C-alpha cells in the first residue's frame, strides 16, 4: 500500500510544472513581432501619401484659383475708387 500511495502523488506534480514552463515561453516570441509591424508601416505610409497628395493638389488648386480671382477683382476695383478720388479733388 505504501508503494502505491507514493507513486500517485509523484506523477501529478510534474505535469502542472511542465505547463507553467510553456506559458512564459509564449510571450517572448510576441515581443519581436511588435517592432516588425511598425517598421514596414512607418515608411510605407508617409512615402506614398506625401508625394501623391501634395503634387496633384497644389498645382490644380492655386493655378486656376489665383489667376481667375485676383485678375478681374483688382482691375475693376482699383480704377473705380481711383477715378472718384481724382474727381472729388
Swiss-Prot record:
Sequence repeats lie at residues 3-14, 18-29, 31-38, 39-46, 47-54, 55-62, 63-70, 71-78. GO terms for biological process: epidermis development; keratinization; keratinocyte differentiation; peptide cross-linking. Residues 75-89 have a biased composition (Polar residues). Induction: During squamous differentiation of epidermal keratinocytes. This is Cornifin-A. GO terms for molecular function: structural constituent of skin epidermis; structural molecule activity. Cross-linked envelope protein of keratinocytes. It is a keratinocyte protein that first appears in the cell cytosol, but ultimately becomes cross-linked to membrane proteins by transglutaminase. All that results in the formation of an insoluble envelope beneath the plasma membrane. Belongs to the cornifin (SPRR) family. Residues 31-78 are annotated as: 6 X 8 AA approximate tandem repeats. It is found in: Cytoplasm. Keywords: Cytoplasm, Keratinization, Repeat. Transmembrane segments: none annotated. Pfam families: Cornifin (PF02389). It comes from Homo sapiens. Residues 3-29 are annotated as: 2 X 12 AA approximate repeats. One of its GO terms (cellular component) is cornified envelope.
